[in-house]
Amino acid sequence: IKIQQLVQKRMETQDPNYSAEQSVQLEVSICGDLQMLRGRIDGFVNLSPNIRRIEEYKTTRSAPDIRRGADWGQVFIYGAIKPSFGSIQSTELELVYIHPDTLQETRFSSVYTPAQLDLGFALILLLYEVREERHRERISYRDQLTENLDFPFAEFRPAQRNMAARNYKALVSGEHLLLEAPTGSGKSIGALYPAVKALKEDEKIFFLTARNSGAEAAIKASMLLQAKNSALTTVELTARRKACFCERAGEEKTFCPFSRGYYDRSMSATNELLSLGSAVKSEIEKVAEKHSVCPFELSLDTATWADIVVGDLNYVFDPYVALKRFQDRERFMLLIDEAHQLA
C-alpha cells in the first residue's frame, strides 16, 4: 500500500488531471439475482475529452514478461464498469508492476472502445454465470438427497441420537450450543450429520479443530455422509507452510512457478477437485501438481464452492491468519472441536 501511495502522490504532482482511489460499482444480474460489483481504481486520468486512462498498480519483485491474466482482468472490469460521461470514444487500460525496493515500473497497456469493453465484460459475466449455475444445480440435487439422508450407521450409539437432535435444533434456530460428551461417543458424526440435514441453499459448514486427529475424524465423518449423498463436497484446509510446494522447498512465493499465472490454470483444477466430492490433502496435491497450481490457493478456491470445510481454528478466530473470503459468518455453521481450547 505504501508503494502504491508513493506512485499516486507522484502522479498527482505530475498531472493535474490525475486522481487516485476512485470508487466504482455496478449492479449486475447473475442467474436472475442482482449482485453488486465494487472496486477502487488506483489511478484515473482524463487524457482528453474523448480518451481516459485507468491504471492498476501491483507490487512485485518479479516483473512479469507478460501481463498476468487475473491482474489484467481486474483493470478490464474497472474499465467496463467505470461510467462514461460525454463523448468518451476509448479507454486506455494500464497495468503497472512496481518493484518495492527500486520502484522500477513495468507497464502493460491496451486501448479499448466502449463496445469492446461491454462485450468483454459480458463474456466475463457469462463465464461466472455458467459456474454459478452449475453450483446451484449441484446444491439443488444435494438438497433433494439430504431430505432422505439417513444416519450412516444402522443405529446410534448411546446418547448419540439425543446429541444429534440437540445439535440440529441449535443449528436451525441459530442458537450457540456448548456440548460435552466423552471420547468415543461419536461426536464428529453426531455434529456433522445434523449440520448437513440443516444446510440451506447458500450455507457452508466449517468443522474447526486444533488437532490432526480432530480433522481426521471430521473428514471420515464427511466421507460417510458422502456415501449417502453423492452431491456433498468436502475440502480439507492445510496450513500454507505444510501445503505449498514452494514453501516446503524454501522458495519465495514471488518466484514460485505454481503461484505465477495461478488464475490462468486454476479453474480446471477447481472443477476437477469439486467433481471428486472429497478434496483431502493428498487429492489436492495430486490435482495441483497435475495443473501446475499452488495447492494452498487451490484448496481455498475449492472451499468457496464446497459444502463442508475442515480446517484449523485459526482460519476463523485468529485475526492475523483468518481467511478474508470467509468472513460472512451469517452464511456459515461453525462446528468447533475442543471448543474449550478457545478460552
Regions found by a protein language model. Give the residues of each.
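Signature of the SF2 helicase/ATPase Hel1-core->accessory helical subdomain module
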Residues: 191, 291-308, 313-343
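Acidic-basic catalytic patches of nuclease active cores, encompassing PD-(D/E)XK
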Residues: 1-28
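Mg2+/Mn2+-dependent nuclease catalytic core
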Residues: 26-121, 191
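Conserved pre-motif I regulatory segment
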Residues: 138-180
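Polybasic (Lys/Arg-rich)
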Residues: 114-147
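Walker A/P-loop
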Residues: 172-194
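A substrate-engagement module of RecA-like helicase motors
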Residues: 142-146, 150, 202-309, 317
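Walker A/P-loop NTP-binding motif
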Residues: 168-169, 188-202, 221-224
